[in-house]
């Protein structure tokens, strides 16, 4: 309501790949937040309100709190073994600058109800471990195993969402099947 009352042109909900086929409560709440946010476009009166609600979905932001790389660097700088769940685990990441640029691109393209997903390459924990060991040295690995609610491989778009997805330049654009106004140039 605050966005509508203050005539905000575009409202952006920033989400995570954890929202795709969630296995735990965190992922489920991210999915629900994303759906509620973009579905807001279905309930506004376009004659009264001009606010467009869009969402962005990406992986880990490099250097953010909870990101694995700073944790690994700290362990290696302290000459401790790396604590990993599974070296075959894959994740997606985006830098702060890439995330900022992506937000700007999405605001330029957004018509309302879309979920914007950057094209990101997956990396494995083994790739990260190898690269960091080359820089800081190898102090061993403590494999603790995949934790409850974790996925071995995150995904950015579900199979069901693919039916409503546009492949557009450096991104994928998921349209709302109930309120799709997006058409790429």
Language-model-derived ranges and their functions:
Residues 1-51:
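N-terminal Rossmann-like NAD(P)+-binding domain of SDR-like oxidoreductases, especially those catalyzing
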């Amino acid at each position: 309501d605050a966005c509508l009352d203050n005539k905000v042109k575009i409202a952006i909900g920033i989400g995570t790949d954890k929202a795709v086929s969630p296995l735990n409560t965190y992922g489920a709440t991210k999915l629900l937040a994303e759906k509620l946010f973009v579905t807001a476009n279905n309930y506004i009166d376009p004659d009264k309100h001009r606010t467009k609600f869009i969402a962005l979905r990406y992986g880990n932001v490099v250097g953010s709190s909870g990101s694995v790389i700073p944790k690994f660097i700290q362990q290696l700088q302290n000459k401790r073994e790396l604590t990993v769940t599974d070296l075959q685990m894959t994740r997606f990441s985006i830098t702060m600058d890439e995330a900022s640029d992506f937000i700007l691109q999405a605001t330029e393209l957004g018509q309302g109800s879309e979920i914007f997903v950057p094209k990101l390459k997956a990396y494995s924990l083994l790739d990260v471990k190898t690269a960091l060991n080359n820089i800081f040295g190898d102090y061993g690995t403590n494999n603790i195993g995949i934790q409850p609610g974790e996925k071995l491989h995150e995904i950015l778009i579900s199979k069901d969402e693919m039916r409503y997805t546009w492949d557009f330049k450096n991104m994928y654009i998921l349209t709302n099947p109930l309120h799709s106004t997006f058409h790429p140039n």
